[in-house]
């Protein structure tokens, strides 16, 4: 089973997105505290001020709340604007 943390930020100005994307590129550095997650970044189609970071954890990781890495990412992005941080899991297969 996989887990997905989605951290979205809404900036006050679209001009901040360049700095925000540069910061996100630095997030790709290896995570040294446990299994390394897969990271993907998305820009909103409808709003130039919205960016979303998707952190995908493999089945070996069990989360009951935001991960330490997710909390670190959220903290870094909070300087840019309003934050939404949600946790999703894949549904368990039925028999």
Task: Give the location of each predicted region.
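Short amphipathic alpha-helical segments
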Residues: 13-38, 68-76
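Secondary-structure boundary/capping motif
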Residues: 8-12, 84-86
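Short coil/turn motifs at secondary-structure junctions
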Residues: 12-14, 58-60, 92-95
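Short, well-ordered beta-strand segments in beta-rich or mixed alpha/beta enzyme
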Residues: 4-9, 40-66
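Glycine-rich beta-strand-turn "strand-cap" elements at beta-sheet edges
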Residues: 37-52, 72-95
């Amino acid at each position: 089973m996989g887990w997905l943390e989605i951290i979205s930020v809404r900036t006050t100005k679209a001009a901040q997105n360049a700095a925000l994307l540069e910061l996100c590129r630095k997030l790709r550095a290896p995570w040294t505290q446990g299994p390394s997650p897969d990271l993907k970044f998305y820009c909103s189609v409808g709003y130039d001020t919205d960016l979303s970071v998707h952190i995908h954890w493999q089945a070996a990781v069990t989360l009951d709340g935001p991960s330490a890495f997710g909390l670190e990412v959220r903290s870094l992005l909070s300087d840019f604007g309003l934050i939404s941080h949600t946790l999703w899991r894949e549904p368990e297969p039925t028999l």
